[in-house]
């Protein structure tokens, strides 16, 4: 998809695991997006079928799901200001989607992902990273790249030079190590490990019953 665009100098981005999104929840997400002034919102576990894009009031939604099953699913929702800066999109599959924005001094590509869980078969994990690598290779080298949301990985508090800082939680697991290696191979830094925050702000996942919390989400950015 190609579109006329107007560059933006700054924008606010966010990400949300909606655990499925019907029409009622879509309206709630739109209202929350407007309330906190988010220009670009990545969404995971959308659980819609098919792929496409459409306008909904002041927001524009790009989405990817499976052809017939309501599982996984990702989307990127942009407000009017963000929509005016869109250069194109890549509706890859039910686990990843990208939208490219005109920016100053560099254009920006945002990729929303929903990685396989720790219980997934190794073949599924490898396919995910192969697909993501292909998506990165389609991204112009000069773009500032952001990859956001559900990695289902724990990178832990151990620092890795040029990839992570020291502000993270827990112990690195196998999924976290795989993510670290992917970042090293592609010159990416995990930005949310670089800044000190209160511990309650580090948790990115809460179980449906509210009993368990974890930090499994990461925001990756190209090293500059």
What are these regions (language model features)?
Residues 1-224:
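A shared catalytic/ligand-binding motif for oxyanion handling
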């Amino acid at each position: 998809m190609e579109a006329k665009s107007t560059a933006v100098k700054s924008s606010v981005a966010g990400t949300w695991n909606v655990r499925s999104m019907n029409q009622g929840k879509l309206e709630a997400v739109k209202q929350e997006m407007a309330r906190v002034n988010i220009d670009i919102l990545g969404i995971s576990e959308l659980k819609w079928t098919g792929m496409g894009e459409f306008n909904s009031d002041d927001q524009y939604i790009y989405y990817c799901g499976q052809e017939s099953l309501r599982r996984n699913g990702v989307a990127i929702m942009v407000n009017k200001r963000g929509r005016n800066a869109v250069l194109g999109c890549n509706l890859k599959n039910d686990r990843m989607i990208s939208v490219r924005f005109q920016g100053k001094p560099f254009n920006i590509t945002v990729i929303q992902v929903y990685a396989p869980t720790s219980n997934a078969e190794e073949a599924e994990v490898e396919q995910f990273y192969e697909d993501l690598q292909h998506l990165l290779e389609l991204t112009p080298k000069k773009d500032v790249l952001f990859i956001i949301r559900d990695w289902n990985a724990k990178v832990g508090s151990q620092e890795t030079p040029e990839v992570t800082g020291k502000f993270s939680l827990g112990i690195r697991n196998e999924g976290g190590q795989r993510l670290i290696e992917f970042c090293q191979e592609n010159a990416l830094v995990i930005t949310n490990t670089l800044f000190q925050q209160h511990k309650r702000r580090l948790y990115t996942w809460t179980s449906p019953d509210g009993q368990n919390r974890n930090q499994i989400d990461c925001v990756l950015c190209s090293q500059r």
